[in-house]
Swiss-Prot record:
UniProt-recorded name of the protein: A-kinase anchor protein 7 isoform alpha
Pfam families linked to this entry: AKAP7_RIRII_bdg
Entry's Gene Ontology molecular function annotations: protein kinase A binding; protein kinase binding
Region: Disordered, residue numbers: 49-81
S-palmitoyl cysteine lipid modification positions: 5-6
Membrane topology category: Lipid-anchor
Name of the gene encoding the protein in the UniProt record: Akap7
Disulfide bond sites: none
Top-level taxon of origin: Eukaryota
InterPro entries for the chain: AKAP7_isoform_gamma, AKAP7_RI-RII-bd_dom
Residues passing through the membrane, by range: none
Residue span of region Required for membrane localization: 2-11
Length: 81
């Protein structure tokens, strides 16, 4: 009886096929990584804009300095020396 081979290609040909299959996966990973970075940057910019807008409206008490003082147990008036 002859030998039963599990691989349809010789080992060198199989490696070439594996390499070809990895390239689209690598391209997909690069694309997804870029998208994640873009989303993170957009989120950071939005957060920055919200924080700067809140600082410009002192009457509402939404400034980040006042919130930090409240977290520490001190009012915003107590932070000034």
């Amino acid at each position: 009886m002859g030998q039963l081979c599990c691989f349809p290609f010789a080992r060198d040909e199989g490696k070439i096929c594996e390499k070809d299959r990895r390239e689209p996966e690598d391209a997909e990973l690069v694309r997804l990584s870029k998208r994640l970075v873009e989303n993170a940057v957009l989120k950071a910019v939005q957060q920055y804009l919200e924080e700067t807008q809140n600082k410009k409206q002192p009457g509402e008490g939404n400034s980040t300095k006042a919130e930090e003082g409240d977290r520490n147990g001190d009012g915003s008036d107590n932070n000034r020396k």
